[in-house]
Amino acid sequence: MHGRHVTLKDIVLDLQPPDPVGLHCYEQLVDSSEDEVDEVDGQDSQPLKQHFQIVTCCCGCDSNVRLVVQCTETDIREVQQLLLGTLDIVCPICAPKT
């Protein structure tokens, strides 16, 4: 630009089209979906095991007996039903006596 005021002849535009860029990807993808096992699906097929603490009374001396088990929520419900039914827990002191 020359002078104080802008004129159209002072503006130079380079109006050449840009170089074309190939946007195609020519890679071949191998279908390996049959070979792979999805880790998330593998974890869903096995229920999550957790630690559960069971505090109950000895059937012989009524002292507190504490157990820690590792199982699923479904299994701990079954243990609960057994404890409410016929299953009795015996402490180490009373175990030799029975």
Curated annotation (Swiss-Prot):
Residues 1-42 are annotated as: E7 terminal domain. The keyword Metal-binding applies. GO terms for molecular function: DNA binding; DNA-binding transcription factor activity; protein domain specific binding; zinc ion binding. GO terms for biological process: DNA-templated transcription; symbiont-mediated perturbation of host cell cycle G1/S transition checkpoint; symbiont-mediated suppression of host innate immune response; symbiont-mediated suppression of host type I interferon-mediated signaling pathway. The keyword Transcription applies. It is found in: Host cytoplasm; Host nucleus. InterPro entries: Papilloma_E7. A zinc finger (unnamed) spans 58-94. A motif (Nuclear export signal) lies at residues 76-84. Belongs to the papillomaviridae E7 protein family. Homodimer. Homooligomer. Interacts with host RB1; this interaction induces dissociation of RB1-E2F1 complex thereby disrupting RB1 activity. Interacts with host EP300; this interaction represses EP300 transcriptional activity. Interacts with protein E2; this interaction inhibits E7 oncogenic activity. Interacts with host TMEM173/STING; this interaction impairs the ability of TMEM173/STING to sense cytosolic DNA and promote the production of type I interferon (IFN-alpha and IFN-beta). This is Protein E7. It comes from Human papillomavirus type 6a.
